[in-house]
């Protein structure tokens, strides 16, 4: 066979193979490659959405954490204020109670002083009568001289 005829036969076979490949083999390969490219693109898009969702979730979590910390700080502040007001109220109540107890004690002391003075006046009056009795060497009648004794008590 001639080189030209062989070359032409090979060209014909090559073009038939190329035509068959382009008609029957190439479209399924291209479809498979397109599907694969689409899956890869979808996967990348999903990854980007996942990243953006993650970033948004982190922002929401940070915002929630911040608001929870602020709420906790507010509650702590409110509790401290309430505790301080309770302490102040207790101090005020204690001061009022102390003042009341002191006033009661002073009133009791004044009453006791008055009672002791009255008792002392009675004793002094009795001693004065006894002294006068001894001086006069006679008995002084207390019933008769009650006005005199009361006046003496008042002077003392």
Swiss-Prot record:
The gene is atpF. This is ATP synthase subunit b. F-type ATPases have 2 components, F(1) - the catalytic core - and F(0) - the membrane proton channel. F(1) has five subunits: alpha(3), beta(3), gamma(1), delta(1), epsilon(1). F(0) has three main subunits: a(1), b(2) and c(10-14). The alpha and beta chains form an alternating ring which encloses part of the gamma chain. F(1) is attached to F(0) by a central stalk formed by the gamma and epsilon chains, while a peripheral stalk is formed by the delta and b chains. It is a single-pass membrane protein. The chain crosses the membrane at residues 7-27. Its main location: membrane. One of its GO terms (cellular component) is proton-transporting ATP synthase complex. Keywords: ATP synthesis, Cell inner membrane, Cell membrane, CF(0), Hydrogen ion transport, Ion transport, Membrane, Transmembrane, Transmembrane helix, Transport. PANTHER family: ATP SYNTHASE SUBUNIT B, ATP SYNTHASE SUBUNIT B', CHLOROPLASTIC. Pfam families: ATP-synt_B. SUPFAM superfamilies: F1F0 ATP synthase subunit B, membrane domain (SSF81573). F(1)F(0) ATP synthase produces ATP from ADP in the presence of a proton or sodium gradient. F-type ATPases consist of two structural domains, F(1) containing the extramembraneous catalytic core and F(0) containing the membrane proton channel, linked together by a central stalk and a peripheral stalk. During catalysis, ATP synthesis in the catalytic domain of F(1) is coupled via a rotary mechanism of the central stalk subunits to proton translocation. Component of the F(0) channel, it forms part of the peripheral stalk, linking F(1) to F(0). Belongs to the ATPase B chain family. The keyword Metal-binding does not apply. It comes from Herminiimonas arsenicoxydans. It is found in: Cell inner membrane. GO terms for molecular function: proton-transporting ATP synthase activity, rotational mechanism; proton-transporting ATPase activity, rotational mechanism. The keyword Iron-sulfur does not apply.
């Amino acid at each position: 066979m001639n080189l030209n005829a062989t070359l032409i036969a090979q060209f014909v076979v090559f073009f038939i193979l190329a035509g068959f490949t382009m008609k029957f083999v190439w479209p399924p390969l291209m479809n498979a490659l397109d599907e694969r490219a689409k899956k890869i693109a979808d996967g990348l898009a999903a990854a980007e959405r996942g990243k953006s969702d993650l970033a948004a979730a982190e922002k929401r979590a940070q915002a929630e954490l911040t608001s929870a910390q602020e709420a906790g700080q507010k509650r702590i502040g409110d509790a401290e204020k309430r505790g301080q007001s309770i302490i102040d109220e207790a101090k005020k109540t204690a001061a009022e109670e102390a003042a009341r107890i002191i006033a009661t004690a002073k009133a009791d002391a004044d009453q006791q002083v008055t009672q002791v003075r009255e008792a002392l006046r009675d004793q002094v009056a009795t001693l004065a009568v006894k002294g006068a009795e001894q001086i006069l060497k006679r008995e002084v009648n207390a019933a008769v001289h009650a006005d005199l004794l009361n006046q003496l008590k008042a002077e003392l």
